[in-house]
Amino acid sequence: MNLAYYSEFKSRYNTPYRVEIYTKKNTGSAKEIRLSGTPFTVEWESDRLYKPLKMSNAVCSIITRELLLDLYTGENQGVEVVLKNRETNTLEWFGFVTPNMYSSDYISLDTLDIEAIDSIACLDNIKYSYMGEKADFRSFSEIICNVLAKADPQKCVQKLYVQNCNKLTSSATACILKSLYIHERNFFDEMNEPMTCKDVLTSLVEYLGMTLIQWKDAYYIIDYEYIDNGYTDCTLFNIRNLTSSNTILPISSKNIMDIGVSSSNGSISLDSVYNKVTVVANTNAIGDLCPDLIDDDDLENQNSDPDKYYTQTIDDTVFLSAYFKSKENWETLQSVEEMDDSNIGGVL
């Protein structure tokens, strides 16, 4: 992508930030834009604490006399928005402009609110595809890193931190994501329709009982109870080459009132905490639970005479028997020229 627009501002704590907007069009030199009094806001999902995916959205407020039509796109990842901390030269947030329609009044000075969602939310519009030529067993780490690479094609984020709260055994040292495997066919239905990459991530992270979040320059798979108990060990993955190493994440507790709360008619509340179990049933109809064992189209008489049969008399009853062979793939225990009542037991 090409840098199309940029702007700089300072937070209420005097921290310098830079907003960069990238488009697929080659616009030549980047153009500086003017931001409003509320230049950039980020909002995180807060409806539930225990949630497999916690996503965020941002609003960049621009003051302009132009229409800036190239900032509105119908593509899922057509326009990228990046927020950088100039003081530490680090990535603060990045995502993509939401595909939507453009509407603006013709007035002398206009404020445009550019809405963006983070890279995890963009996965809702990307279908899962096999990692190789065909479906195969893949580790959780392979699948998750492959999906996150689709979420970030520009490679803004290279790191994935996974807390070591789950283990196969008490003495295991390897990250559980490298030890758990699943077949890729599980992500396709009976009609071969793939799940979205977002649903794939949800199913894997939910199975682990953890939460995936995009925070600054990395992705994190965390467990709130593990953090609350003071554990800081985790595995760091490189999303692009799947290399991993053990590391420690610094964790500190802060009082909300010490951080400071400033708002207008705002409130602080503690949401209810509960356990929730969701059971999903496949409602696709099954046409035939027990299909026919023998396919008539696959059978042919073993004799040149199609009317040949064998007789067997038991008491006063005469039984007629005929034997057939498969055109395709039936295998016998031993090869015989002709099956009859005397050798049938040793052939099948």
Segments and roles (model prediction):
Residues 1-76, 107, 112-149, 247, ...:
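Juxtamembrane "anchor/assembly" segments of surface/extracellular structural proteins
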Residues 56, 93, 110-112, 208, ...:
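Residues that flank catalytic or metal-binding motifs in active/ligand-binding sites
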Residues 87, 295-348:
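Polar, enzyme-active/binding microenvironments
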Residues 106-254:
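Charged- and aromatic-enriched interaction segments used to assemble
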Residues 41, 86-88, 197-205, 323-330:
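Short, solvent-exposed secondary-structure boundary motifs
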Residues 25-27, 87-89, 225:
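Solvent-exposed strand-loop boundary residues in beta-sheet-rich modules
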Residues 80-116, 213-215:
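Short beta-strand and beta-hairpin "edge-sheet" elements
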